[in-house]
Amino acid sequence: MSAEAEAIVTTATADVSSPSKTVAVEPVAADTTPDNAPAVSTEGSGKAEQERAEKILKGKELFSQGSRNFLVKSYDEAADELSQVCQLYEEVYGELADELGQPLLLYAKALIAMALDENKVIDVPDEAADDDDEDVDDDEEESAEDGAAKKEEKKDTKEAANGASSSNGKELDTIKEGSDEADSTGEAEQAQSDEKPSKKVPTGVDEVSSSNGGGGAAVNDDERPSTSNGEVTASCSNGAAPAVEEEPEEEEGVSGSLQLAWEILEAAAQIFSRQGLSGLPYLAEVQTELANIEFENGILEAAREDYEKALKIHGELPTRNRRALAELHYKIGLTYLMQQLNKEGATALRQSSVLIEEEIAEIKGKDEPSERDRNNMLDLEETKQEILAKIQEIEEMQAQTIAEVRAALDSYIKPMSSGDAAAASSSSSSSANGAASSSSSSSKGAAAASSSTISSSSAKPTDITHLIKRKKPEDPSSEAEALCSPAKRAAV
């Protein structure tokens, strides 16, 4: 054995046999119990920190995915991912923490966009149903025409068969009866076989007419009810009825999404208002989204007030975002126009166009504008032209309204003025006639008075000679007769 090995063995035996070493080992064994307890607590805290870090990392990944889906307008997926982000951040940071501000804002915007898309898509199934109805009607007309043609062919064949039977006798009659029975049984079997696929496919008119042949088509045309009460119409109505029944559910979903977005925005507003100057841009965006919800619900005055609040918040920012300001003025103008306040709406739209012109001038003033700046400038130019066209339309509408009002007033005032003139002329003529009549009457009265005075002054007797009966003059013959006759003589 070598010297080194002997030294190792001797030192090992010395360590085992040494009492001081055993005494030194005893306190170490006694100290292991308290040393193990903090080791367990550190392991638990390490796991908690690890879980917390994993949640934060997962939340960041989900937030980036949700932001990307929001930008590409996949609002359903964005809303799902951002809701998970909000849940994870609330577990990690607590309720209404500063880290929850931006996820809540983007989540609310995704809900609003999703509700708007659902609201736009509501009428599409009805249009599709109308198209289906038109297609089914066309198919039914075609199948009816085919059936009529096939019926005529069948009648021709039957007439030919009848002529042959009359010429050939009873044998052909029996053959024809057998063929008719075979046709009837075949048609019944085909009708039964056609009822099964017609139940499965409600609108398969072309398939039924093409698979059955001549006789089957004729049977289907006879057995199938008309369009007003038939299976095809029933299937279309059954297909359209769920769409009509689903409309209230879709409207409830839209209102529920907007209500949830409203509550989320209120929570985000509390977070950003607590952050001070750094949270003002997000607070202005929150106020704008609240106004958008009110605008979509038709609460125009409240929406306009919230838009004006957003304008006020933008005024407190150190940098001026002209595009956001132009959009706010445009929305305010729309609220005015929807309330038939054309003058105020045109004023707001002009302010929006002025801000857009300033933004375009700033982009043009750059020495080397980027591709993004050039694209933005083109978009702004297009938006400006649309706003100016809207303003021109409003002005033309106002001018037309004013012209119509003036024409109506003129048409109303002219008859009145002509009536007044006629009344005035009639009154003047009547007054003139009255004056003339009064003058004539007065002249007549004066003449009568003068004649009365003249008659009274002259005192001429009235001529009543025509009333006096005069005696006939006595003839001399009568006087001689009277003298001759003793009877007529006067007594002396």
UniProtKB/Swiss-Prot annotation:
Gene Ontology process terms (BP): CENP-A containing chromatin assembly; DNA replication-dependent chromatin assembly; protein stabilization
SUPFAM superfamilies, sorted: TPR-like
Protein's cellular compartments: Cytoplasm; Nucleus; Cytoplasm, Perinuclear region
Positions bearing Phosphoserine: S179, S184, S193, S478, S485
Sites of Phosphothreonine modification: T32, T33, T185
Region of interest: Disordered: 1-52, 123-254, 418-492
Compositionally biased tracts (Basic and acidic residues): 147-159, 170-179
Biased composition (Low complexity): 1-14, 418-459
Gene inactivation effect: Eggs laid by mutant females have reduced viability with evidence of cell cycle defects, and many fail to hatch.
Major location (coarse): cytoplasm
Coiled-coil spans in chain: 377-400
UniProt keyword Ion transport present: no
InterPro entries membership: NASP-like, TPR-like_helical_dom_sf, TPR_rpt
Keywords on record: Coiled coil, Cytoplasm, Nucleus, Phosphoprotein, Repeat, TPR repeat
Role, per record: Component of the histone chaperone network. Binds and stabilizes histone H3-H4 not bound to chromatin to maintain a soluble reservoir and modulate degradation by chaperone-mediated autophagy. May also bind and stabilize monomeric H3. Maternal effect gene essential for early embryogenesis.
Family affiliation: Belongs to the NASP family.
Subunit structure: Interacts with the histone H3-H4 heterodimer; the interaction with H4 is probably indirect and mediated by H3 (His3, His3.3A and His3.3B). Interacts with His2Av; this interaction directly or indirectly destabilizes His2Av.
Protein name: Nuclear autoantigenic sperm protein homolog
Organism from which the protein derives: Drosophila melanogaster (Fruit fly)
Lineage: Eukaryota, Metazoa, Ecdysozoa, Arthropoda, Hexapoda
